[in-house]
């Protein structure tokens, strides 16, 4: 059996199309243009790529988009002042501070300063609490992308046994909450879980978000299970010649080639969950704009 490959590119393009249609409707019917502000502190190359992508995609769907690039030596009070200005700006409905921040800045304090109504990363404690309580919330983008991919692949998730490997605030815990709300039976596993392979083998849905390259092997996967690989790990090429040249590639937390022989469906890395994350950021910005404007539906 060869698993179905869940194509993140196709799903992300579809979601961006839906967002663009909704933005056009809001602009036509309500004269409301959803606005996203992205804040980048420092010059981390990966963060610059992510921020540029977010800006380009938000403009492409018709949103108002602003990027604030601050020097690496920006003080905490300066960053908090900018966040306060964005909180008060009626043209901005979503605020995203690109993480990680330089080490001298307090990430938790910065996230806490963002208005929960504009927290499109879904990291504010208010949104985390609302999600855990089953109340409407802005949900972290990667877990939201995982849920969309699962529903596209499986339809109704009711009664499925789901195992989430990883307990981070960014992915593991929120994706578990979303799966619970979808009426799955959920287990959160992690590096200290006893007999982790056996726990994984119980899963109809296996979400890997542990940050260890190719940790989850094919014989950890229940035949026919749906595997969502959130991991993004840079490793040397298997080819010794390329590895000797310092060349690297991206792999997930799942051993992809082995998973293909066992799973019913699996997301690739790259080309899977990562592509959904930016699309879900756009969706969250539209959701925030509608809630702030009191627009239903």
Swiss-Prot record:
<keyword id="KW-0554">One-carbon metabolism</keyword>
<dbReference type="Pfam" id="PF00763">
    <property type="entry name" value="THF_DHG_CYH"/>
</dbReference>
<dbReference type="GO" id="GO:0004488">
    <property type="term" value="F:methylenetetrahydrofolate dehydrogenase (NADP+) activity"/>
</dbReference>
<dbReference type="InterPro" id="IPR046346">
    <property type="entry name" value="Aminoacid_DH-like_N_sf"/>
</dbReference>
<keyword id="KW-0560">Oxidoreductase</keyword>
<keyword id="KW-0521">NADP</keyword>
<comment type="function">
    <text>Catalyzes the oxidation of 5,10-methylenetetrahydrofolate to 5,10-methenyltetrahydrofolate and then the hydrolysis of 5,10-methenyltetrahydrofolate to 10-formyltetrahydrofolate.</text>
</comment>
<dbReference type="InterPro" id="IPR036291">
    <property type="entry name" value="NAD(P)-bd_dom_sf"/>
</dbReference>
<dbReference type="Pfam" id="PF02882">
    <property type="entry name" value="THF_DHG_CYH_C"/>
</dbReference>
<dbReference type="GO" id="GO:0035999">
    <property type="term" value="P:tetrahydrofolate interconversion"/>
</dbReference>
<feature type="binding site">
    <location>
        <position position="232"/>
    </location>
    <ligand>
        <name>NADP(+)</name>
    </ligand>
</feature>
<dbReference type="InterPro" id="IPR020867">
    <property type="entry name" value="THF_DH/CycHdrlase_CS"/>
</dbReference>
<keyword id="KW-0368">Histidine biosynthesis</keyword>
<comment type="similarity">
    <text>Belongs to the tetrahydrofolate dehydrogenase/cyclohydrolase family.</text>
</comment>
<feature type="binding site">
    <location>
        <begin position="166"/>
        <end position="168"/>
    </location>
    <ligand>
        <name>NADP(+)</name>
    </ligand>
</feature>
<keyword id="KW-0658">Purine biosynthesis</keyword>
<dbReference type="InterPro" id="IPR020630">
    <property type="entry name" value="THF_DH/CycHdrlase_cat_dom"/>
</dbReference>
<keyword id="KW-0378">Hydrolase</keyword>
<keyword id="KW-0511">Multifunctional enzyme</keyword>
<dbReference type="InterPro" id="IPR000672">
    <property type="entry name" value="THF_DH/CycHdrlase"/>
</dbReference>
<dbReference type="GO" id="GO:0000105">
    <property type="term" value="P:L-histidine biosynthetic process"/>
</dbReference>
<dbReference type="GO" id="GO:0004477">
    <property type="term" value="F:methenyltetrahydrofolate cyclohydrolase activity"/>
</dbReference>
<comment type="pathway">
    <text>One-carbon metabolism; tetrahydrofolate interconversion.</text>
</comment>
<protein>
    <recommendedName>
        <fullName>Bifunctional protein FolD</fullName>
        <ecNumber>1.5.1.5</ecNumber>
        <ecNumber>3.5.4.9</ecNumber>
    </recommendedName>
</protein>
<dbReference type="GO" id="GO:0009086">
    <property type="term" value="P:methionine biosynthetic process"/>
</dbReference>
<dbReference type="GO" id="GO:0005829">
    <property type="term" value="C:cytosol"/>
</dbReference>
<dbReference type="GO" id="GO:0006164">
    <property type="term" value="P:purine nucleotide biosynthetic process"/>
</dbReference>
<keyword id="KW-0028">Amino-acid biosynthesis</keyword>
<keyword id="KW-0486">Methionine biosynthesis</keyword>
<dbReference type="InterPro" id="IPR020631">
    <property type="entry name" value="THF_DH/CycHdrlase_NAD-bd_dom"/>
</dbReference>
<feature type="binding site">
    <location>
        <position position="191"/>
    </location>
    <ligand>
        <name>NADP(+)</name>
    </ligand>
</feature>
<comment type="subunit">
    <text>Homodimer.</text>
</comment>
């Amino acid at each position: 059996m060869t698993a179905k490959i869940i194509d993140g590119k196709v799903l992300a393009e579809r979601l961006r199309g839906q967002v663009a249609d909704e933005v056009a409707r809001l602009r036509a019917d309500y004269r409301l243009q959803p606005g996203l502000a992205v804040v980048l502190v420092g010059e981390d190359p990966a963060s610059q790529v992510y921020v540029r992508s977010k800006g380009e995609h938000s403009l492409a769907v018709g949103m108002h988009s602003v990027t604030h690039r601050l020097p690496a030596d920006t003080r905490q009070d300066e960053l908090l002042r900018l966040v306060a200005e964005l909180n008060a700006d009626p043209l901005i409905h979503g605020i995203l501070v690109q993480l990680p921040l330089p080490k001298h800045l307090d990430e938790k304090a910065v996230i806490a300063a963002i208005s929960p109504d504009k927290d499109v990363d879904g990291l504010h404690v208010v949104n985390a609490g609302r999600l855990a309580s089953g109340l409407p919330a802005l949900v972290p983008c990667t877990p939201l992308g995982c849920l969309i991919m699962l529903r596209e692949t499986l339809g109704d998730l009711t009664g499925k046994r789901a195992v989430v490997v990883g307990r981070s605030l960014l992915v593991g815990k929120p994706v578990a909450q979303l799966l619970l709300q979808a009426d799955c039976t959920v287990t959160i596993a992690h590096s200290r879980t006893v007999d982790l392979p056996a726990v994984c083998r119980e899963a109809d849905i296996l979400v890997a978000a542990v940050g260890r390259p190719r940790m989850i092997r094919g014989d950890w996967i229940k035949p026919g299970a749906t595997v969502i690989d959130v991991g993004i790990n840079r490793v040397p090429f298997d080819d010794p010649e390329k590895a000797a040249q310092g060349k690297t590639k991206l792999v997930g937390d799942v051993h992809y080639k082995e998973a293909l022989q066992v799973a019913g469906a699996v997301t690739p890395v790259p080309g899977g969950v990562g592509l959904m994350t930016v699309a879900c950021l756009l969706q969250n910005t539209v959701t925030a704009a509608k809630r702030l404007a009191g627009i239903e539906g």
